[in-house]
């Protein structure tokens, strides 16, 4: 039997390889010529355990790939496995499916019998529409939805829990018999076959995934009732699971659904058209427009950009796992997230919970995409802002030579003033701005009629300007002050040590070439260069996105698309500022260090270095009693040190002899290099409880580069939203399905309402909140459930006394509420105390919000201190029987 598989994405490639393993002659068809060529070389674009081995086993034997549809003429069965991506509302995009059907119509003979199998995930009614398109052809259409789980998809293909087959007419045995022959392997293994109609088969796929979410939401909802009637949700879940009609899976209250996910502060790298941006998962989710976002990924040979398919978030109350690797790199993810592991020379997938110390991950390096010359059209960028109203252009030649062309567009009361002084309102020239190109750098922009500081209307990011950006990121800042009548003025400053003459002169020469005026200030051993220009400040802050101070500095997106020589010049300015050369081992060895307090700057620099083949280590620390995290990036290994060391200019001469005197070529420490990636080992695995949102993404190749440049698998998708949309498209309100999301979002509100219902009115009530940070033994308040609950209590008029065992957590809470007085007034309705027993004194209720072992405290003493013996245990941490014997009323979560 000859089989064709149209579409060689995730589903299609596994289907083609699997059928080839069954012994069929299989042709995979895809419109991507480069992918087809790679597949015919045995190169697998997806990372699934066992997939590449099977591909190499069968390719160019009984498995081939092509961009042509001609092979389907000789195929008995044609599988449609093209993508049907969902939009933000859950609608399936069926354009690729129907396009493939049209290609089939153009290729096959109307009289030749074919079985066309739709494996793509499609809405109900799609198979019927396809048959209608093929009504003049001798074909049967079969619905055969896939149930592959990313990370173990090859295993799932060969070991399905059931095979779903939907047909137009169950009395027509021909297509049924053919499909049973195709899947004889499963028949022989006694895998259940469900033979049904089209619509039933289509709905089974969505219903299965959505039901898992519904099951979880059900148990979470039941936990609320359990609280109300004083039952124990843990015992209920266990007992329910013993019933074979129900089963014990997905019955853990409070966990929620949504698959694998990232901590909100983890980062990834996106491209929205200008170049790579370092962005947190939370920030990506909050972007209003994600339609054209691409994600930095890895295609097996090199770094590449892949389209973002989906970004989502969910509430999570369970363990997060931090995987720590060599070189100070790490990632924090949920325990069920798929991790890309290098094993026996192949990339495989493991769930986070299965990862062990010593497992290997990879850091891809090398350039991606097309490098190009980059020019900033400053006038065009300003035209999109209110600042354009205050911008002028000075060009005497333009005003004189082109006056008759310009005159109709002038808003001046006396147009000939323009011809006389050569100064034009920028907004007047916009309709004919192309005329400026004739005069190039003579077009000067400014925002004050004095023309004290002007800049070119376009700036090319050449070697000089790339160095200037680097100097700015290391030594620069943007300040704002106010002149007469409240006029805002902005200045760019760069500050060097007076001994850094080479770097000072370099900056001055660059500015002189651009015709940009500056002033110099020398004081107390420092040499500052100051540029008063609101426009240039806008370029650095808003066009290049460089940031304005050390805390928010970042590498411009444009730099990642620049030519390699430009990248090196940028690094030259960067390392000359905040970089340093360090002698080691009694002056026998060297390494290079770069320090920053900007998290995004650190992550972006690591990626930029990886693009250039440099692999660095990173250390997070607090320097000199600072409360701000610093990132120290270190470069070692002789060849790497020499490459970066030469960027320092004359300073390198003081260290060059040490590098030249190395007795052997010392390789970099902490990793091994392959042709296109570095290999790191898992050194430590840390588990910690987390309550808060986690974020998911899906990319078109299921891979992405995340924090510290690590390659990782994307998240597992869910079908709840798609099913909701199909309900709505059929004018049915999906009450239960919609509720699955709502239940999982409402847990903290429900817990608050539980407290409120006990008292009736919280106004004037005093509560001890035990635990302030988001988890035990930390001072981190981000995503803290305690803080969110405190806000709710304060808004209801309650008085809150907070306590945490960690001193810094207490300090951070005090500082946070002193800065933001919108909800709490520290010292009036909010107090943070250093002693637990002082905290509980005279309170109306105790609320536990963090998983500390409060059982070790003296609850008899606590009972004598409180006004009312009532405990709201948000973590189910206390010994219930012990507490009740002491006279406390106890309220847990589902207990």
UniProtKB/Swiss-Prot annotation:
Keyword Transmembrane part of the UniProt annotation: no
Binding positions for NAD(+) per the UniProt entry: 2-19
Gene3D superfamilies: Cytochrome c1, transmembrane anchor, C-terminal (1.20.5.100), Hedgehog/Intein (Hint) domain (2.170.16.10), Homing endonucleases (3.10.28.10), NAD(P)-binding Rossmann-like Domain (3.40.50.720)
Highest taxon, organism lineage: Archaea
All copies of domain DOD-type homing endonuclease, residue ranges: 468-614
InterPro entries tied to this protein: 6-PGluconate_DH-like_C_sf (IPR008927), Hint_dom_C (IPR003586), Hint_dom_N (IPR003587), Hint_dom_sf (IPR036844), Homing_endonucl (IPR027434), INTEIN (IPR006142), Intein_C (IPR030934), Intein_endonuc_central (IPR004042)
Pfam families hit by this protein: Intein_splicing, LAGLIDADG_3, UDPG_MGDP_dh, UDPG_MGDP_dh_C, UDPG_MGDP_dh_N
Key words of the record: Autocatalytic cleavage, NAD, Oxidoreductase, Protein splicing
CDD domains: Hint (cd00081)
Biological process according to GO: intein-mediated protein splicing
Active site, renumbered: 261
GO terms assigned for molecular function: endonuclease activity; NAD binding; oxidoreductase activity, acting on the CH-OH group of donors, NAD or NADP as acceptor
EC number: 1.1.1.-
SUPFAM superfamilies recorded: 6-phosphogluconate dehydrogenase C-terminal domain-like, Hedgehog/intein (Hint) domain, Homing endonucleases, NAD(P)-binding Rossmann-fold domains, UDP-glucose/GDP-mannose dehydrogenase C-terminal domain
Protein modification: This protein undergoes a protein self splicing that involves a post-translational excision of the intervening region (intein) followed by peptide ligation.
Oxidoreductase recorded as keyword: yes
Family: Belongs to the UDP-glucose/GDP-mannose dehydrogenase family.
Family matches, as NCBIfam families: intein_Cterm, intein_Nterm, NDP-sugDHase
The name this protein goes by in its record: Uncharacterized protein MJ1054
